[in-house]
Amino acid sequence: MKEKLIIKNFGPIESIDLDLGKITVLIGEQASGKSTVAKVLAICRYFSYIVNDSSIVNENYESEFVATALRDWGLNGYEKNDSYINYINSDYSVEIISEKVEINKEFSFYSFIPKIKPKSDSFRDLLKSLYEIKPRAEENSNIEVIWGIPHSFLMTDVKSVMDNPFYFPTERGLQSIFSLGKSSIPNLSDSLFNQFAKLDQIARNFKNEVEIEPLNLIYKNQNGEGYFKIKGQNEFYKLSQGASGFKTSIPIILGIKYYNSLKRRSKTFIVEEPEQNLFPTAQKKLVEFLVGSINSSNNNFLIPTHSPYILTSLENLMYAHKIANGNNGELKEKVNEIIDEKYWINQEDVCVYYLGDGTHKDILQRDEALIDKDYIDSVSKSINSEYDQLLDLDVAMQN
């Protein structure tokens, strides 16, 4: 089954009900709720929050894990009376309801009542194992414990069933200054700063040369410093002195390559604005890289974006799949000559939503495997209209 995420009365979101595919794209203007959706999904997929509160399965009482998670991800203050979040996947569901608690006329706060329901046998077995091991860990000071859960349990039992998503924030280009400390990046939440720490560590693992296909680059890390060169050339340059597009895109590619190399289970990646500082051709190649990762490693992606090139590139990959698999596959070889088969994707694995005015609209036209880009093209129409009006004035003056 597809994942589902429902959010109501939370931050800029009034009411959305999203099916999530292997790749889900969110478009919309600034402050439309794209990042809110991305961070809520991250919270609901984070096993440290979910498994640590396994004691609330099918129960209804206040829990601190929601408040902690919102604070960690910079979403505290987004809650409202009757805020509602419901996340469902094949293993478990998480339902969260907020209630306003008024102490007196001058002071009130929101309490959160979560409910977690197992859906798969593997998740039920996971919770059963946790019930058995957690009391022993709490009694034995020699066992390394994270949030009350033994570290060994997180690294083996939990990861065999579920895995944390990896979040690439818009600030990812700043990961090189991670060592300066969190205070060097104002207004950055703890969890996003932790992503910088992971990116920094991942980058250090690539001591040998690795190809960055979408940018036609070669990357390597020496003594904690990133270096790159143009493929086919000899001289390396410091990444810190490279183009902005390199700084924002290389972390994405390294992170995905790293987790693919582990060959464990599929991974969910949340990539905010992958188009940052990239020429349209590079955006196209990056989309191909992401879809190729889905096909080779069964990964999942959530992509908040503003770029029409991201949408058009994804549309072409869906259309290629549709044509190649129609008419008994007669056109498969010819389609492969245009777009490599490893980048094709079934439209059934894709979801595209426009967010605005607190709600959403599904803009994927599945009959034709096309994305309704009127929501972006309307801006072009407005710009063209202004140009036409200016042109009319100019022509009138010439006459």
What do the predicted segments below correspond to?
Residues 1-52, 227-383:
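Switch/communication elements of ASCE P-loop NTPase nucleotide-binding domains
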Residues 47-269, 341-399:
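Phosphate-coordinating catalytic segments in nucleotide- and nucleic-acid-processing enzymes
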